């Protein structure tokens, strides 16, 4: 028997689009009241914050984190856009650290977002670069990841120091909740720099913040060195490393979302304040509180100068990349400090090769298709 569906007409700058929503009554969020956590509610949520979510995704290659069986079920990270898609869906081609390529979704309007939500996409993970030049990021992202033993107050405090550090450098930061445990601070930059340069700048910023509040913040890559502190994850600026976009829904029973904030709101903000139920009325009242981000372009040169000063005055050079990356120029031994040595170097190299091979297989091996009605089981 064919799955039930509804057809939604969506206004876009290119004209009306029709988005098919299959199984609209399917429960996606068990922590919400009846009639609030269905698949149709997820899709309509994205329509309600259209201007904001599109601002964060516009012209960016985007990875889809799909939960076709609901928020508490298995996740699928989909880098390649499905072949079975409407003709109006736009795409972008990107290159991975392995040298392989993929064609990813490239949202240009809310119809793209709603179409992906019908596939079970909860959160959207865009590249920090645009389709016109995928090799040059136009966004510096600071990911504040709280380690066990830290509190939400700690995360907010660290975010405030990130803002201070950016201000000292003549840069403007925009803060949002992750929708999960942490906070993100975004800076628009000119697309003139490579991923290597922008990542290195993120590392320098993380180290600067950690030096200002060493008991609360760390930029140490190895978990054994982080302690009970907030980790500033500089590797989120490495190629093909992404984080959930503004207004993305997270895989939690309560359907929390990644909420853009005004800095004045941060001291009182809680992750649980922002859900697919509470965000639409907030958006209707305030609009997108990050509406000015595209016009607030910060210079990256002060951070690049900080990189040079840290190297010259403190001997702080490169730091480890994620395991799926090949050995990078200037990178130290990619092995935990507690097991460092010649044997560890060989193990680290072997682990990196294995991780890269696994990542390539994951990207190129198609997932077995679910029975569908032409769109999605989700």
Each PLM stretch: what is its role?
Residues 177-187:
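Short, conserved phosphate-binding/catalytic loop or strand-edge motifs used
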Residues 28, 71-74, 84, 150, ...:
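Flexible loop/turn segments at secondary-structure boundaries
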Residues 164-172, 211-212:
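Secondary-structure boundary elements
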Residues 2-16, 35, 43, 47-148, ...:
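SsDNA-processing nucleotidyl-transfer enzymes
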Residues 1-44, 54, 58, 119-139, ...:
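C-terminal accessory nucleic-acid interaction domains of nucleic acid-metabolism proteins
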Residues 186-199:
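Catalytic palm subdomain of template-directed nucleic-acid polymerases
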Residues 137-139, 172, 182:
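Short glycine-rich loop/turn motifs
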Residues 64-67, 173-179, 220-224:
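Short beta-strand
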